[in-house]
């Protein structure tokens, strides 16, 4: 017959297995919900990019049909009113621009624009103007020409990041979900973090400096980002344990990342 000690050990074993099963079930259900929310934001971001690139090609066709500066200005100002973009730029390969009103300046783009334009492909990048908020800029090199004496190699429209962030809904989990859009090398395109204490410029570097992940785990995650894979894991930042979910996008080799505190998700 089974002695009391064996029964206790067997009961303890069953208890541990049950707790492990419950923990794994909670983890799978929680990350599945997070992945669903991230996928929804991903689709909305892709649709935003598709629509705005389509607008740029439409504007290019108009620019090819006329060289009348006043007509061009009226057309673009009407388009801006209808669509709601922040700015329209005639852009040279070195980042200098002119607006339809004739204002000139330099668009601080986070990329080597001349190399990108040489490829002849549409571009979506982060940019900043002095004293203004970060912007997401859509660039189309389909048409080159001159506007009010300014020679341009591409046209572009911009949105302030606040407008883009509306797509990355962090209202779930009582507003405790942080979302990021990153390049595959970890550089941050869009930072939609809650309770932000400092700007994150590279997500991988942030994890290396501030998380409990080993170097091997970080390298594996970096490879997932580089290959556009999807996945999930737990990570500790400071004193808080988080679910981290990520999904590659079809937009310019970006990856979307979501971070939500474990205790918030498990309480939902």
Segments and roles (model prediction):
Residues 93, 97-171:
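Extracytoplasmic/periplasmic ligand-binding sensor regions of membrane-associated signaling proteins
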Residues 2-4:
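Short, small-residue-biased leader/transition segments that mark boundaries at the very start
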Residues 144, 156-168, 185, 250-254, ...:
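Helix-start (N-cap) segments at beta->loop->alpha junctions
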């Amino acid at each position: 017959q089974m002695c009391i000690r064996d029964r206790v050990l067997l009961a303890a074993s069953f208890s541990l297995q049950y707790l492990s099963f419950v923990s794994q079930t909670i983890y799978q259900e929680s990350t599945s919900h997070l992945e669903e929310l991230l996928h929804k934001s991903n689709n909305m971001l892709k649709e935003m990019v598709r629509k705005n690139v389509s607008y740029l090609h439409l504007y290019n066709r108009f620019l090819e049909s006329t060289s009348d500066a006043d007509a061009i200005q009226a057309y673009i100002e009407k388009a801006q009113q209808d669509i709601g973009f922040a700015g329209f730029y005639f852009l040279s390969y070195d980042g200098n621009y002119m607006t339809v009103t004739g204002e000139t300046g330099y668009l601080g783009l986070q990329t080597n624009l001349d190399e990108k334009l040489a490829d002849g492909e549409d571009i979506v990048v982060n940019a900043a103007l002095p004293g203004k908020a970060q912007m997401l800029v859509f660039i189309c090199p389909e048409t080159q020409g001159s506007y009010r004496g300014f020679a341009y190699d591409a046209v572009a429209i911009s949105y302030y990041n606040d407008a883009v962030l509306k797509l990355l809904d962090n209202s779930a989990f009582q507003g405790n979900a942080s979302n990021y859009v990153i390049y595959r090398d970890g550089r941050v395109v869009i930072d939609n973090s809650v309770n932000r204490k400092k700007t994150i410029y590279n997500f991988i570097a942030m994890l290396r400096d501030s998380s409990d992940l080993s170097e091997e785990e970080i390298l594996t995650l970096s490879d997932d980002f580089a290959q556009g894979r999807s996945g999930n894991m737990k990570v500790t930042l400071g004193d808080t344990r988080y679910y981290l979910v990520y999904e590659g996008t079809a937009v310019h080799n970006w990856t979307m990342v979501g971070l939500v505190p474990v205790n918030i998700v498990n309480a939902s």
